[in-house]
């Protein structure tokens, strides 16, 4: 038997799928233009049509805090279990925590 591959996007069929109304490759410009400051709380909401700066699927829906900026991307501190993880995420995959509700 051959071992099945476990790539970066395994088991994400329904998680990384857009609804038919949201189809299309271009994220909204307003979502790209948002500037986050250090200390802002954000929700990681992966946009599956944008592959650059995409975090791993385990971070989908997690709330984190902006701790810095690296190029166009942001450094986001996320609690995963009992550990703090720092991930690099582009703004296409972030939503402000206050406006997410």
Curated annotation (Swiss-Prot):
Keyword Lyase (UniProt): no
One Gene Ontology MF term: structural constituent of ribosome
A Gene Ontology BP annotation from the UniProt entry: translation
Biased composition (Basic residues): 1-18
Region described as Disordered: 1-23
Keywords from the named record: Ribonucleoprotein, Ribosomal protein
GO cellular component: ribonucleoprotein complex; ribosome
Superkingdom assignment: Archaea
Cell cycle recorded as keyword: no
InterPro entries associated with the record: Ribosomal_eL21, Ribosomal_eL21_arc, Ribosomal_eL21_CS, Ribosomal_eL21_sf, Translation_prot_SH3-like_sf
HAMAP family referenced in this protein's UniProt entry, alphabetically: Ribosomal_eL21
Family named by the database record: Belongs to the eukaryotic ribosomal protein eL21 family.
Protein name, UniProt field: Large ribosomal subunit protein eL21
């Amino acid at each position: 038997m051959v071992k099945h591959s476990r790539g970066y996007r395994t088991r994400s069929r329904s998680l990384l799928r857009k609804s038919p109304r949201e189809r299309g490759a271009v994220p909204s410009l307003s979502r790209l233009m948002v500037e986050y400051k250090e200390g802002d709380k954000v929700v990681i909401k992966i946009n599956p049509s944008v592959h650059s700066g995409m975090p791993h699927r385990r971070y989908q829906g997690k709330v984190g805090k902006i701790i810095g900026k690296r190029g166009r991307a942001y450094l986001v501190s996320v609690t995963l279990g009992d550990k703090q993880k720092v991930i690099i995420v582009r703004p296409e995959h972030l939503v402000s925590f206050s406006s997410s509700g």
